[in-house]
Amino acid sequence: MGKPTGFIEIKRREPDAQPPAERIRFYREFEIPLAESEVSRQGARCMDCGIPFCQSGCPVNNIIPDWNDLVYRNRWREASAVLHSTNNFPEFTGRICPAP
């Protein structure tokens, strides 16, 4: 699952956001997505917890550890299939997810 020491070695990174002065001019996405390489690095932070509370606590039962591992390994199509196996609308539910 991910990189065994990834949680320690790789600092958590959130997407940047456009400044408010820019985003008030339009109704588009204001988060600036991370590059694919950075998303993959973030996937390496997933630990083999034994009891993945991220998954058991997920209201839509996403298989988060498997998904993160596939992202870490750049297996994007498989990661998408795993995510869509439990969640038809990840782009919506991801915005209201209670986890940071």
Model-derived features with residue positions:
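Ferredoxin-type iron-sulfur electron-transfer modules and their immediate structural context
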Residues: M1-P100
